[in-house]
């Protein structure tokens, strides 16, 4: 592996790649724009290079779902068609297309031969043992984690404006801690039970002290890192079908999956007071991480090396 820093006065990427004189290198591109901007350069430098397009998530699918929520927003339609074109082109040009979940691998069979599709998901593993984490009665409040990303902004608005009023009508003691720089664009939300904590370098304290992780995502794509992070610390999760996709979660076994605001609010209230259900979800947290394990990743990398080199 090598790292290249481009200083155009002295060098450029093409000259650098040619000087390496690599034999059948793997050129791995992260996200569609990087692939489209650079795959020809990789081929020019090494005619036998193997092109890997790592999708991260399916951008056009995310915008398609956003259109369903906001059909009049022109930017969603514009981005949908833009990324549909780019992702179709990249999947056709690449020798291997890496998706983040088996759901997205199946979806991408519309655009690429299934023989060149492979799922490599996020990597998560337990950071504590179940014996090391606080018990049901040692925890309080619910946790949301999100950066400045449109699906996260929508999720926070949905949570605070539509879900939590139903919750607070029955239990107004439940607080909501929101971690991540989503706070920078949501200053209009002010509520005594809601704390916007901004970027937190080490989230372990919140993952250990919170009673529930919530992920009320109404659109998006890919595998949601916030849910994997909760499982790392045996923190039970309430989410939506969009939040759960790609992780092979079973409702009321690995997580509670709610379709609408009423069901989501009821799930929070039930899980917040039901120790038996809470422990059931907690006990299944580690099994939920198996598709996201380091061992699974190593097997997939071995598969790439055997099939492409």
Where are these regions (language model features)?
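Short acidic/histidine- and often glycine-rich active-site loop of Leloir-type glycosyltransferases
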Residues: 241-252, 256-257
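Short hydrophobic beta-strand element within catalytic cores of glycosyltransferases
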Residues: 226-230, 236-240
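Conserved catalytic-core segment of nucleotide-activated headgroup transferases in glycan assembly
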Residues: 72, 92, 96-98, 102, ...
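A short, well-ordered alpha-helix in the C-terminal region of glycosyltransferases
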Residues: 277-291, 303
